[in-house]
Amino acid sequence: MHRIKSKAIKNFLFIFFLIFGHPVYANCNFNTSEYITELQNPKNITKIDITIPDSKKWNKNLLKITLDRSSNINPKYRDKFNSNLKVFYKFGSCSYNARVRISGDWKDHIEFNNGSFKASLDVKLFEGNILNAVRFKLLIPKTRNSINEVIGSLIMREFQIISPETFMTNVSVNNSSSTYIFQENSAKEMLERNLKREGPIFEGNEDLLWSYKDFEIMQLEDISLSRLVNDSWAKKGLTSTLISLNSFIELQKIYLQYQNHEKRSSNQFLDK
């Protein structure tokens, strides 16, 4: 009986977050209240269409990145562009105002085929959400080992490990169509979808890997630890600050222990 009540409460909270977490859908040509369950299933998305009005400036920016001598994407080219985004479902469509920029660190996030650019995107919706995500990435599949990224996410979910919503979908950017990986950002919406309370979210800090000119790329990997993604939550109050700080310290210790273990294992192998 206790398990049944617990499951019922979790289901209620899940639906509550989906409906009231933020304005659920922007401008849709169907009654969203009749499709609440279907709108949370990525299988019902048939296509995402993105139009960047200032397409000339967008393409010029991608060209600059391509011609830049550096092997990684210089932060100065991460300009944000207003866009119109439309999601097509099996039962209708929804339109959003959004902002996009190029995603990724390396130039493999840009392709040029048949006279047009294709790039991985960071997307932010100004209103509503898609599968409860306000911020998400549309990634060129090869940058994440293609379908393996989706499979990995599904496996983690089976083991009840929090993982972002990840799936393949058709995307058109300024009338250039291709297959992309949709992946929600690590944010409070991801925690809500996994029925978790909002808290600190950490990810590997890659800035040290290629942001310092005096060092070779990846030379500082041993001291590249973690960083707090949602620092705004940590600033909400003393309790959230202490939780974030203590979690940050513990995670850094784990990173350092791992690096030390790897070094010892490598040295033992070389000694043999």
Protein language model annotation of sequence segments:
Residues 2-12:
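Bacterial N-terminal signal peptides that target proteins for export
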Residues 88-220:
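Conserved ATP-binding subdomain of kinase catalytic cores across diverse folds
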